[in-house]
UniProtKB/Swiss-Prot annotation:
Record keywords: Amino-acid biosynthesis, Cytoplasm, Histidine biosynthesis
Pathway stated in the Swiss-Prot or TrEMBL entry: Amino-acid biosynthesis; L-histidine biosynthesis; L-histidine from 5-phospho-alpha-D-ribose 1-diphosphate: step 1/9
Function: Required for the first step of histidine biosynthesis. May allow the feedback regulation of ATP phosphoribosyltransferase activity by histidine.
Record-given protein name: ATP phosphoribosyltransferase regulatory subunit
Gene Ontology CC terms: cytoplasm
Molecular function per GO: histidine-tRNA ligase activity
Family statement drawn from the similarity comment of this UniProt entry: Belongs to the class-II aminoacyl-tRNA synthetase family. HisZ subfamily.
A Pfam family annotated for this UniProt entry: tRNA-synt_His
Subcellular location: Cytoplasm
Note: This function is generally fulfilled by the C-terminal part of HisG, which is missing in some bacteria such as this one.
Subunit and partners: Heteromultimer composed of HisG and HisZ subunits.
């Protein structure tokens, strides 16, 4: 085997892509900070049981596992940063009020999520802990859309769903609850024949409501239809009210409602949102409410947040990260050294061409030169 080969769906990030990823990372983290979010940096490696407190079987399958040579315990390479941030909020910070946290870091997946998807993503996201009201979901939704606009994306479609609708239907019918996982699979896949089979012997109200869900999709007007076709339960009424407010506050984007879109249902406890753009089949950002995420760490708090993959964002973002630079000669000259240092202190990129390599400058557009004029070093256009 060649020593330069990498595992399948693992790739190096070369300078041009890395520069774009870093540009977007800085933009997004600066924007998160402007909203009051504090950055945390959880470790890449943790005890397996700490990483798998939520997310179900899917997260377990996506997590790389290895044995700790010091303790003999099983470790995991994180596949999702959200449980780690929940641990930090619940166990380390232990604050009583609202906490806003953000992060950016690598996650590893045992299997790619698509044919050409990477197994090493750079996950960036933001989360609010400590507020159960819809105001937190509205802020997270706004921040997610703000981040995508900051990355230069336009014509965004926001898909909204709510875990509370199915949860309310299952809670009122024990027989349906026993088939919860199968019903979830049928609804998520819009498998109407399977859904009909699973609901044949259920109560009439539950059967009609579950069979209605795959047809309750479209723009925000579908919520009015949902109010007539679903049982009048407090949880369902609240879920539909939440979706109406989220849709009304999503300014400048297309909004779609899908009450059968339950991806992440086992993880979420309330509103769920995903962002799409034309030409990209998968969601570029996902978020929602997951109030139970900190329970395994001994402190369950209301929580809502979103995340996205920076590598995928960089692939589709029109943001240009090719920087301009100043080309300077290489010489042991104190005045030249002082001039170069002053320019770098001012934020300029100054590349000193090493002897014999004056024209090997592929990655930066050197649009200016540092030249000596009348005993002084000055910057001139090239």
């Amino acid at each position: 085997m060649s020593t330069w080969l990498l595992p399948e769906n693992i790739a190096d990030v070369l300078p041009s892509e890395a520069r774009k990823i870093e540009e977007l990372r800085r933009r997004l983290l600066d924007r998160f900070r402007s909203y009051g979010y504090e950055m945390v940096m959880p470790p890449l490696l943790e005890y397996l049981e700490s990483l798998l407190t939520s997310g179900g079987a899917d997260l377990r399958l996506r997590t790389f596992k290895l044995v700790d040579q010091l303790s003999g315990r099983t470790l995991g390479l994180r596949a999702d940063i959200t449980p780690q941030v929940a641990r930090i909020d619940a166990h380390l910070l232990n604050r009583q009020g609202v906490t806003r946290l953000c992060y950016a870091g690598h996650v590893m997946h045992t299997r790619p999520r698509g044919l050409h998807a990477t197994r090493e993503q750079i996950q960036i996201g933001a989360e609010i802990y400590g507020h159960a009201g819809l105001e937190a979901d509205l802020e997270i939704q706004q921040l997610m859309l703000d981040a995508l606009h900051l990355a230069g994306l336009s014509r965004i479609r926001l898909d909204l769903g709510h875990a509370g609708v199915l949860a309310a239907l299952l809670a009122r019918d024990a027989q349906a609850a026993e088939r919860g996982e199968s019903l979830y699979d049928a609804l998520s896949g819009k498998d109407v024949p399977l859904l009909n089979e699973l609901t044949d012997d259920l109560g009439a109200d539950t059967r009609a409501a579950l069979r209605a869900l795959p047809n309750l999709y479209g723009d925000a007007s579908v919520l009015a239809e949902a109010r007539t076709r679903l049982p009048v339960l407090p949880e369902i009424t609240r879920a539909l009210d939440d979706l109406a407010q989220l849709a009304s506050q999503a300014k400048g984007v297309e909004v779609a409602i899908d009450l059968a879109d339950l991806r992440g249902y086992a993880y979420h406890s309330g509103a769920m949102f995903s962002a799409y753009i034309d030409g990209v089949p998968n969601a570029i950002a996902r978020g929602g409410r997951y109030d139970h995420v900190g329970q395994a760490y001994g402190r369950s708090r209301p929580a809502t947040g979103f995340s996205l993959d920076l590598r995928e964002l960089a692939r589709i973002s029109p943001v240009e990260a090719r920087g301009t630079a100043i080309l300077a000669p290489w010489a042991q000259d104190d005045a030249l050294g002082a001039a170069v240092a002053a320019l770098r202190d001012a934020g300029e990129v100054v590349i000193q061409a090493l002897p014999g390599h004056d024209h090997v400058l592929d990655e930066f557009a050197c649009d200016r030169s540092l030249v000596e004029r009348n005993g002084a070093w000055v910057v001139e256009p090239r």
